[in-house]
Amino acid sequence: HVANADRRKMFGFDTGPVNIISNYMCKVLFGMEYDKDGAIAASGKVDKGLMDHFMNHPFWDRPVPRSGWSQDYSEEYIKATIQKFSALPKEDLLATACAFTGEAVARSMKENVPEDIIKSTDKLYASGGGVKNPQIMKEIQKRVPDNIKVTTSAEIGIPPEYKEAIKFATIAYS
């Protein structure tokens, strides 16, 4: 979401499912609600085939503003993905899910944010549950332009758990 006093320069959209995929994979593969501290994902390797699978999801065909959430990346979609890539180590599935989040943010910026705004931006404020996963934050930082530091919305006094309210207010206003 880009906030600006000039409403014509303000826009908002989802960059993808963020931690929906990794949390559900943790539940199915490891019997855990989420990957605490991103430790499991950090022990895996990113798989190109699985990454391509995620990046070819129909979500990417929709124009912004768009929202990507549990209807797009449903339990059925994630179960089918796990089955399709069952030959991969479980840790690699999770590592790729986290890397996909970083790739999704970078792709969304490149495709939808004017280049001059990207070049003049020095911080990306992340919010939501994904900010609690250091591996997701690392993957985002690795993929966004070097001039941008990825941090959480807490740095500017907005609790990360208020993501949904902020997201939909920005999308509605833009």
Language model feature labels by segment:
Residues 123-133, 165:
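Glycine-rich beta-strand-to-loop/alpha-helix junction loops that act as flexible
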Residues 32-33, 38-123, 134-148:
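A contiguous, well-structured pocket-lining segment that forms one wall/lid of small-molecule binding clefts
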Residues 21-25, 81, 105, 109, ...:
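Buried hydrophobic packing segments
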Residues 1-40:
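Glycine-rich phosphate-binding loop of actin/hexokinase-like ATP-binding domains
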Residues 9-12, 88-92, 153-160:
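A short glycine/serine-rich beta->alpha loop
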Residues 12, 37, 126-127, 152-153:
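Thr-Gly-centered strand-to-loop micro-motif
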Residues 26, 95, 99, 151-174:
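Glycine-rich phosphate-binding/hydrolytic loop that grips phosphoryl groups
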Residues 132-135, 158-159:
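Flexible loop/turn segments at secondary-structure boundaries
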